[in-house]
Amino acid sequence: MDHLPIFCQLRDRDCLLVGGGDVAERKARLLLEAGARLTVNALAFIPQFTVWANEGMLTLVEGAFEESLLDGCWLAIAATDDDAVNQQVSEAAESRRIFCNVVDAPKAASFIMPSIIDRSPLMVAVSSGGTSPVLARLLREKLESLLPQHLGQVAHYAGQLRARVKKQFATMGERRRFWEKLFINDRLAQSLANADAKAVSEITEQMLSEPLDHRGEVVLVGAGPGDAGLLTLKGLQQIQQADVVVYDRLVSDDIMNLVRRDADRVFVGKRAGYHCVPQEEINQILLREAQKGRRVVRLKGGDPFIFGRGGEELETLCHAGIPFSVVPGITAASGCSAYSGVPLTHRDYAQSVRLVTGHLKTGGELDWENLAAEKQTLVFYMGLNQAATIQEKLIAFGMQADMPVALVENGTAVKQRVVSGVLAQLGELAKQVESPALIIVGRVVALRDKLNWFSNH
């Protein structure tokens, strides 16, 4: 280990920054955020330093560096574009046993500054020891995506609860289980982020009052249309915290590969060799797993509240008093249209878009007259088996037979396939496509020839 990672308490302590340019500004921001009493020395300063000085946030000393500026300092940073000046600052600091960082010259410095993920009071530092700053930055960006923005608020709140938790739970094991439940409670984290004191109090009291083994919850997560890159950051965080993931066939293998390795996986979709699990049975699976005290993720393709029956599942949980939350996903209409070069709205062709289910409960009927109106785009979910009926009804209610249509199979996936034509051909076109597929009807489909980008990659 070439460097010892430490966190310095600089609040109200004198620090010196030598340099007045853009690089020095970035260092100054970090020192000010840490509460340092900062003096900045340079021959000239960019405007931001003057702004800070006028606000009383730091002291500017214009002119050449002098060793006396280090008097009383705890820490120094040399951030000029003059190597000789930087070396002078480093040597002067070294002689006084003051730690000094020299920008872009780790061998000349007595300390280096890592890439930082700030979720105060939680801090994560990443460093390559100065050998590969770009690698450290890329790793920091990866970690940033995995750590929720509100994590710091959760950590701060946990600090307020420590004494009470220690008093209520006698053993270390009980305390550990409680803290694990608290740190992955998405409803609590969201309430803290929203400064909803009432909800925070209610959730906390519920967690403290119930037996530890009976504090399960369900998170309804939209997996997006297929491409794993379209899964939201919050969705990724949830599937990596799950004890059990209940999923269907619209969730891609690439997304399932991101699920926490030791999580149980329950498949409830329809696949060759399997029977489709009835919705009521799915509801009971969610209920049963949550009642075991487990963190359950119900992972659904697209967005769970757009033809995903998410509302029905949550009604069951609500009736049973099971805590739940929802993470929306990119719905298939948005993903498939974007990846097939079909804008759902366009000033010249469509001022509205309608998302329509291709099948209803028994006895249901669509409002075909309004669906056949001009200047709109129709997107039919689960409509492949009803394509001939959709064609017949739309034409019967006045839509032109030459209206452009597109069928998007496996939208956003590497194996995406798009079949296009006109409304009069829809029934026949559907025979060329396999589920899962989406039907898009509207003048905007004609733009596909110009705007299609995905198939070219």
UniProtKB/Swiss-Prot annotation:
The residues listed in the UniProt record as binding NAD(+), with positions renumbered to this chain, are 22-23, 43-44
Q: What keywords appear on the UniProt entry? A: Cobalamin biosynthesis, Lyase, Methyltransferase, Multifunctional enzyme, NAD, Oxidoreductase, Phosphoprotein, Porphyrin biosynthesis, S-adenosyl-L-methionine, Transferase
A GO biological process of this protein is: siroheme biosynthetic process
Whose protein is this, by species?
Citrobacter koseri (strain ATCC BAA-895 / CDC 4225-83 / SGSC4696)
Q: Which PANTHER family match?
A: SIROHEME SYNTHASE (PTHR45790:SF1), SIROHEME SYNTHASE-RELATED (PTHR45790)
Known role: Then it catalyzes the NAD-dependent ring dehydrogenation of precorrin-2 to yield sirohydrochlorin. Finally, it catalyzes the ferrochelation of sirohydrochlorin to yield siroheme.
Please indicate if the UniProt record lists Electron transport as a keyword. Answer: no
The taxonomy runs: Bacteria, Pseudomonadati, Pseudomonadota, Gammaproteobacteria, Enterobacterales
Q: What is catalysed by this protein? A: uroporphyrinogen III + 2 S-adenosyl-L-methionine = precorrin-2 + 2 S-adenosyl-L-homocysteine + H(+); precorrin-2 + NAD(+) = sirohydrochlorin + NADH + 2 H(+); siroheme + 2 H(+) = sirohydrochlorin + Fe(2+)
This protein's pathway reads: Cofactor biosynthesis; adenosylcobalamin biosynthesis; precorrin-2 from uroporphyrinogen III: step 1/1; Cofactor biosynthesis; adenosylcobalamin biosynthesis; sirohydrochlorin from precorrin-2: step 1/1; Porphyrin-containing compound metabolism; siroheme biosynthesis; precorrin-2 from uroporphyrinogen III: step 1/1; Porphyrin-containing compound metabolism; siroheme biosynthesis; siroheme from sirohydrochlorin: step 1/1
- Segments for region (Precorrin-2 dehydrogenase /sirohydrochlorin ferrochelatase): 1-204
Q: Which CDD domains match?
A: SUMT
Gene name on record? cysG
Q: GO MF terms on file?
A: NAD binding; precorrin-2 dehydrogenase activity; sirohydrochlorin ferrochelatase activity; uroporphyrin-III C-methyltransferase activity
Binding locations of S-adenosyl-L-methionine:
225, 301-303, 306, 331-332, 382, 411
Q: What is this protein called?
A: Siroheme synthase
What are the positions of the active site?
A: 248 (proton acceptor), 270 (proton donor)
Q: Which family does it belong to?
A: In the N-terminal section; belongs to the precorrin-2 dehydrogenase / sirohydrochlorin ferrochelatase family. In the C-terminal section; belongs to the precorrin methyltransferase family.
Q: Which residues carry this modification: Phosphoserine?
A: 128
- Location of the region described as Uroporphyrinogen-III C-methyltransferase in the Swiss-Prot/TrEMBL record: 216-457
- The EC designation for this entry is 2.1.1.107, 1.3.1.76, 4.99.1.4
